[in-house]
Amino acid sequence: MEESNLFETTLYDGELFLLPSHLQRMKASAKSLGYSWPGEQYIENKLREAVQDTSMARVRWELSKAGDVTVQIVPIQTLEKAPYTLILDKQPSSTEKNPSCINKMTNRAIYIEAMNRNDAQYSKAQDVLLYNHQGFVTEATIFNVAFHRNGQWITPSLKHGLLSGTMRKNLLENGSIHEDDKGLLQKDNLKNGEQVLLFNSFRKVCKGVLIIQPEKACELLKKKDSSEKLS
């Protein structure tokens, strides 16, 4: 099996968005998995050198087990935030204690398989909502998620097997979302057509519509946005 690298992705728009959180997460994963760590300053210097000739870009960097760092820059003009269709997965995934879920790794088989079996395409603003074998909602394949419950937005608990996203961390710290400590976010409690918040450090926060019955996707996406606001 090919060795998996650690990686991070963020938005550069004059600043590398949430860079300290990205470096902190990568360092923690490197320590946990036995990857050589070249140091935060070394990585930051490589990133700043890579973006110096662009004003806005998608920035991705990888860390090999030997401690080698590679940086990829994709310049962009604007950041589209089209509403996403979030499709409930057809089957549970083994996410608990899965290194590829709780760390950000280039081995993304669990996410690729979910996209494929649900015929979802990122190019069509589609993603898939995963849940574990206990029925607890975890995350989408490229986003953390939050659902509106009891007057507030709540996000799945890390104990169910999901990535501790940097944007998730930011929203929790500023009180915009709250962690689900009551087990409310279960597959069987979801509602077809309900609004969901999707977030990562590249697209920041996007709106989405949950589709439990895919054939109703087009109809639901035409409905007026919910009056619920991110508080």
UniProtKB/Swiss-Prot annotation:
- What is one GO biological process annotated to this record? carboxylic acid metabolic process
Q: Which reaction does it catalyse?
A: 4-amino-4-deoxychorismate = 4-aminobenzoate + pyruvate + H(+)
A molecular function annotated in GO for this UniProt entry is: 4-amino-4-deoxychorismate lyase activity
Names of the cofactor(s): pyridoxal 5'-phosphate
Pathway assignment reads: Cofactor biosynthesis; tetrahydrofolate biosynthesis; 4-aminobenzoate from chorismate: step 2/2
* Subcellular localization: Cytoplasm; Nucleus
EC numbers: 4.1.3.38
Give the originating organism.
Schizosaccharomyces pombe (strain 972 / ATCC 24843) (Fission yeast)
The protein, known as: Putative aminodeoxychorismate lyase
Write one Pfam family the protein is assigned to: Aminotran_4
Q: Which Gene3D superfamilies match?
A: 3.30.470.10, D-amino Acid Aminotransferase, subunit A, domain 2
